[in-house]
């Protein structure tokens, strides 16, 4: 895997077309995600976004990474807040690239079924509108809804 990422890095460095650079970064992110190197995969997905801000697929990939990593706390309700962060990325994907709306909406529907119940959040002192920072490698803040 490291060798293939090295080839991607070389291609990204040599490429002058920003859209192609974005595509290389996105493909590298997919390879890393498939090999469970999530933090590094997210770095490449973010690079893909830097090179082409109008593509929604990198945001969808990041959302899928988050949804595959919901266990960062001993508190189940907090873990389920990870799905809010994933949904945030899917909303962003739709806003920058309407062509991915159908795929994003399907995932939003799926991930919404895994978000915490109001009563579970209540028991740990969290309510709708509060912000939660997702732990572990994700490290992003999201709003409870």
Predicted regions and their residues:
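Residue-level recognition of tetratricopeptide repeat
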Residues: 1, 18-21, 54-58, 100-101
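Residues in the short coil linking paired helices within alpha-helical repeat scaffolds
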Residues: 1-3, 37, 82
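Solenoid-like repeat scaffolds
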Residues: 10-18, 47-52
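Short coil/turn linking the two alpha-helices of tandem helical-hairpin repeats
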Residues: 16-19, 30-36, 63, 68-78, ...
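Terminal, low-structured helical/coil segments at or just beyond the last alpha-helical repeat
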Residues: 92-145
């Amino acid at each position: 895997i490291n060798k293939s990422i090295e080839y991607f890095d070389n291609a990204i460095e040599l490429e002058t077309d920003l859209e192609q650079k974005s595509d290389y970064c996105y493909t590298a992110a997919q390879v890393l995600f498939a090999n469970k190197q999530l933090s590094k995969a997210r770095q490449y997905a973010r690079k893909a976004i830097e090179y082409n801000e109008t593509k929604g697929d990198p945001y969808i990939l990041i959302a899928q990474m988050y949804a595959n990593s919901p266990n960062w706390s001993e508190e189940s309700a907090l873990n389920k807040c990870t799905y809010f962060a994933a949904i945030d990325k899917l909303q962003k994907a739709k806003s920058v690239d309407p062509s991915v709306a159908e795929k994003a909406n399907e995932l939003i529907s799926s991930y919404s079924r895994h978000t915490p119940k109001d009563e579970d959040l209540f028991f740990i002192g969290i309510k709708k509108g509060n912000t939660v920072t997702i732990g572990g490698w994700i490290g992003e803040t999201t709003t409870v809804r």
